[in-house]
Amino acid sequence: MSKKYNVGIVGATGMVGQRFATLLENHPWFNVVCLAASSRSAGKTYEEAVGKKWCMDSPIPENMKNIVVMDATNDIEKITSQVDFVFCAVDMKKDEIKALEEEYAKHECPVVSNNSANRFTPDVPMVVPELNAEHINIIPAQRKRLGTKRGFIAVKSNCSLQSYVPALFPLQEKYPIKKVLVCTYQAISGAGKTFETWPEMIDNVIPYIGGEEEKSEKEPLKLMGKIVGDEIVSADSPAFTAQCIRVPVSNGHLGAVFVEFEDKKPTKEEMINIWENFSGRAQELNLPSAPKQFLHYFTEPDRPQIHSERMLEHGMAVSIGRLREDTQYDYKFVCLSHNTLRGAAGGAVLLGELLAAEGYFD
């Protein structure tokens, strides 16, 4: 791509915002020109605003250190005049986020969001680029509702889904799935925390993550849904049930998946072959952040593991293992992904690349 887009990060000081900053530092298509956060950070340089809260392994990007942070709520006009689109990862109440993202869109500024507020707005595409890239075709209908020419909102799905739904998607296309039971084991960075800021998680497991189980049961059906008229209609099946558990791991979500097929079921060999040969629109377009191979299957009985697999293909691949027949369901297996790369900022950057490649920012 010859053109480079000027972008902003709204919610730049939080953990996901910091991850956006590191991913966009040397991005071939996107140039960060604007950083925004709460009024507490506004007026400070990015380095001053983040201070000791910086929690990435790499240092604050040199080209962003001295950018003066704007107020995400009160400087919308100024922000939108400087950028082609924004990435959004703010920590606010859901109704406030929904209103904020619409305000940016109505200022003719596309929003690529990591937030959950608009995931079930009927004409807002919730996209994993390898799985349901065609859902961005709803954007003209959304623009009509908003009364915009350029502005729109596109979102990524919940971080936990991106460990196990990619494994189900290509199976569902060839062998319809009846029901899925999934137990997720989720890293503390999914709550925006580190062990320094959440010492209670050391040597501990918390069997509850607020709202996570509902998201894990509903969001896959929207990803599997279809555009009907001016909205995306969620699929009726498969039926999902989920249990979500917080575990003492810095990064990486793992899902233990049990699956039952409608009628004919594939063999284990067929399932592994489907996974290893699956690719989507992100690979077709050769997007900069896309993994060369999206799904990787491991034959070792003790894989995938957080330490060895979470950074596979720069943290953008999904690792699968332990596929075997089950006594109650047809099969069971384990999936793993990096929750702040594939599951959050990395997935949003990939969505931004898809939208750029398909001409939605022009």
Model-identified regions with their sequence ranges:
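Charged docking surfaces used in two-component/phosphorelay signaling
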Residues: 189-362
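N-terminal Rossmann-like NAD(P) cofactor-binding subdomain of oxidoreductases
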Residues: 2-201, 205-207, 239, 312, ...
